[in-house]
Amino acid sequence: MRAEIEALAQDIRRSAALLKRHLNWDEALMRLDELNASAENPDLWNDAGAAQKIMRERNELDSAIQGCRALERELADLAELIELGEMEGDQTVIDDAEEQVRALKERAAKMELETLLSGEADHNDCYMEINAGAGGTESQDWAEMLLRMYTRWAEKHGYKVEWLEESAGEQAGIKSATIRILGHNAYGWLKTESGVHRLVRISPYDSAARRHTSFSSAWVYPVIDDTIDIQINESECRIDTYRASGAGGQHINKTDSAVRITHIPTGIAVACQMERSQHQNRARAWDMLRARLYEAELQKREAAAQALEDQKTDIGWGHQIRSYVLQPYQMVKDLRTNVETSDTQGVLDGDLDMFMAASLAARVQGQVDQG
């Protein structure tokens, strides 16, 4: 086996060992046996909430255990295949197997990174709000570019995207939008994207072709299920109904059924306009508000994070997390981790994993450093 491939094999073995340590392997195997026994209990579904919790834990633990075993099994199979190819002098077999080792290394690295997603709500679906900053059409166009960037990222990772609210810009773009991203670890990955995003480019809306700086924000909070009890006093909320203001098309329900709920004590406001009836929009908006209040509580409990609403000051120079420069040169730079790339088009097409991974690792390291 060539030195390069042997080094990759060692990396895969290290990743598998780390994953096993993270799981507390022996304890994880015993816990899975317990969960499997519980799942076979005919009385399990007498308590639907408890049953869902058990089944969710079982599925996640089984997936993690099988993932570790698959790494070790596939690496052993590929090593045998390479050895066989070398014995028979079949370079095609060797080349194919080595390519599979490289792909396995990438998979192992991703699995290792996902061990960092251990927060209380990291495995949940999430809501994402995009809001344009000051600057009119420029910022509104940038907000729509951000929305496209995140939907492309979600599609590349096999996540489903639901549109909940969209407010069209005056000439182009959007003033705001809210989407729901459904998939395992959606919140864990996207929580690193909350903050202000800055764009520098030659404006397509400026006849003098001058360079403009625009700001838009992304705010992410987890979808919560019925096992998490968030009490809301309805007397502390204001409910408004209005006509949907989006541009129409597949995402917007153009009726008078849109609903906005404002939680007066915190100032948190949510809106939904995508369902067909006001009743449905109202129910979805209450779910969104519960999720926002839960996220605010999570932020208070996390030593490494500030309270969510304290972050939401004016969308401008403060609280920037990333800068996107398209002219006079091309560079996207994360201001928290200093990770950067000149592939601006790739980033705007949803290639965000390098930024998310670095930010997630830095956040976890910060929690370790703080105690």
Swiss-Prot record:
It holds the Pfam family PCRF. It is found in: Cytoplasm. SUPFAM superfamilies: Release factor. GO terms for molecular function: translation release factor activity, codon specific. Keywords: Cytoplasm, Methylation, Protein biosynthesis. It comes from the Bacteria. PROSITE patterns: RF_PROK_I. InterPro entries: PCRF, Pep_chain_release_fac_I, Pep_chain_release_fac_I_sf, PrfB. Methylated by PrmC. Methylation increases the termination efficiency of RF2. The modification N5-methylglutamine is found at residue 250. Signal peptide: none annotated. Coiled coil: none annotated. GO terms for cellular component: cytoplasm. Transmembrane segments: none annotated. Belongs to the prokaryotic/mitochondrial release factor family. Peptide chain release factor 2 directs the termination of translation in response to the peptide chain termination codons UGA and UAA. This is Peptide chain release factor 2. The lineage of its organism: Bacteria, Pseudomonadati, Pseudomonadota, Alphaproteobacteria, Rhodospirillales.
